[in-house]
């Protein structure tokens, strides 16, 4: 078995865990490699280009927060991904640092279960396709002279056209990310839906809408000038021209996250979003 390891190199705790993990793997003669950035930060010569990892590795380990897991999952190509939470929030990273060894034991022995998560696929007019686990984000861009109008079609039927700072299309997994911050609903992970969430719309009647994930969404920006950022999981991938149409639908590829059977979704929401009746006192 061979592992691909991604590390949040800005966190000393993640780097420390990476060193402990490699010692654990070496002691068991289990092969591993890092992505180039992680290897450089650790001074390790065992690395491969990110695009090659899925061909040579059997499983992926993300040491960091949800951002590190998103990066690892982008290159996993449906290989199992185990997330060790060294971040602040950790909706996706299933295991704490103390649980890492149990998770690794289960992964090596094959005694683990999987949470399968849907992805989004955005196709440009050029034919290029991009994928994301959390969301596809259309933004107005800094050069726009006036608030642009975003036109949305569902299965080629007009849903609406309205002025806003942007539009988020999120999976159920991504509903607790940017979409939630923009006023979108929280959606249970196994729900077969997407949510379309406007960012600061210039109209009180414009609200997020939940749609079936078998729908095809087409979005264009109605503006006379400017370039408009297209982001996948928060990372800018393209600048769109005015009127350029992007087609978004469910990707045929999915992400397999190694499940922590001790985690309960309601408990996660209570803890991460402070929904408990017990609130910090500041003492």
From Swiss-Prot:
It comes from the Bacteria. It is found in: Cytoplasm. Keywords: ATP-binding, Cytoplasm, Kinase, NAD, NADP, Nucleotide-binding, Transferase. NAD(+) binds at residues 66-67, 134-135, 145, 163, 165, 176-181. GO terms for cellular component: cytoplasm. Its cofactor is a divalent metal cation. Its main location: cytoplasm. One of its GO terms (molecular function) is NAD binding. The keyword Magnesium does not apply. GO terms for biological process: NAD metabolic process; NADP biosynthetic process. Pfam families: NAD_kinase (PF01513), NAD_kinase_C (PF20143). Belongs to the NAD kinase family. Involved in the regulation of the intracellular balance of NAD and NADP, and is a key enzyme in the biosynthesis of NADP. Catalyzes specifically the phosphorylation on 2'-hydroxyl of the adenosine moiety of NAD to yield NADP. This is NAD kinase. It comes from Chlorobaculum tepidum (strain ATCC 49652 / DSM 12025 / NBRC 103806 / TLS) (Chlorobium tepidum).
């Amino acid at each position: 078995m061979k592992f691909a390891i991604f590390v949040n190199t800005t966190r000393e705790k993640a780097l420390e865990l990476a060193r402990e993990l490699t010692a654990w793997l070496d002691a068991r003669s289990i092969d591993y490699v890092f992505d180039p950035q992680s290897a450089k930060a650790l001074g390790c010569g065992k690395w491969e280009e990110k695009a090659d990892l899925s061909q040579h590795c059997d499983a992926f380990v993300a040491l960091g927060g949800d951002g590190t897991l998103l990066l690892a999952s982008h290159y996993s190509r449906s290989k199992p991904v185990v997330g060790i939470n060294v971040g602040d929030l950790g909706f996706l990273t299933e295991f704490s640092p103390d649980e890492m060894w149990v998770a690794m034991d289960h992964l090596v022995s094959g005694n683990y279960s999987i949470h399968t998560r849907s992805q989004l696929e955005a196709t440009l007019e050029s034919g290029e396709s991009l994928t994301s686990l959390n969301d596809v984000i259309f933004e107005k861009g800094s050069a726009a002279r006036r608030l642009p109008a975003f036109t949305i079609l569902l299965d080629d039927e007009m849903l609406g056209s309205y002025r806003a700072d942007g539009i988020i299309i999120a999976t159920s997994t991504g509903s607790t990310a940017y979409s939630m911050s923009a006023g979108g609903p929280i959606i249970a992970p196994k729900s077969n839906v997407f949510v379309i969430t406007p960012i600061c719309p210039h109209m009180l009647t414009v609200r997020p809408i939940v749609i079936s994930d078998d729908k095809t969404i087409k979005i264009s920006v109605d503006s006379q000038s400017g370039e408009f950022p297209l982001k996948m999981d928060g990372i800018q991938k393209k600048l769109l021209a005015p009127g350029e149409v992007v087609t978004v639908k469910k990707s045929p590829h999915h992400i397999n996250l190694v499940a922590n059977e001790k985690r309960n979704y309601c408990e996660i929401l209570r803890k991460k979003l402070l929904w408990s009746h017990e609130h910090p006192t500041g003492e």
